[in-house]
Amino acid sequence: HLALSSDDTDPAFAPEAFSPFYQRSMYQSMRNLMGQTIRMLRARQADMREEMQRQIGLLVSHQDRLAERFDFFLKRRMSVSRIRCHGDLHLGQVLYTGKDFMIIDFEGEPARPLSDRRRKRAATRDVAGMLRSFHYAAFGTLMEVTRSGALGKRDFAGMEPWARLWQIWSSWAFLKSYLETAGRASFVPSDRSELKILLDAFVLEKAIYELGYELNNRPDWIGIPLHGIEQIIGTAETAGN
């Protein structure tokens, strides 16, 4: 992000302020994505396994409460700049050469139209993509091993807290290093409460996008984003109490 925003003489890469119109369009896009994805889920819900049906019911019952995470974009002017971002940042886009890391595939999320992928965005959206990726790495592996028969349901229940611990620790280490490196940049909120609000919104948006993507391309994988959304609901309820 520091590299992508370093040349303010090139209009294609120069950081830009968020306008009220742009924030409203972000809000509408997020609400539309949630509504479309839930409609697709409900249309196929009857054909899914019992556990997935339960998770979908949980998502539907908390839909309005979850959507409140997007209200920030209507109610408050963002203090950060928007920049040219990766657009689909996750662990699969990061390659280790043996000495350093390389980031690949800057074309953005494949399910989004090109016009949308060309926009400058909040850098925290990429950060949220990485945070979701740590969840995918932990629970995707756990679910695949369970599906193969190497782990039973009891074993899964016993391993789940350890997977969650790894996810939390990895996410914390990544976010801490990111803020230490780029924390003073114009694309990072100086107000940590704003940073949390943005990350909460973008992590939810990413999980909903993943849900729609998996539903259309890899239906057997929808359990991972459903599990992630269930985590979000559980965290919100704990914070509310």
Protein language model regions, located:
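ATP-dependent phospho-/nucleotidyl transfer catalytic cores
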Residues: H1-H86, T97-I103, E109-K120, T124-R125, ...
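Catalytic-loop signature of eukaryotic-like protein kinases
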Residues: D88-V94
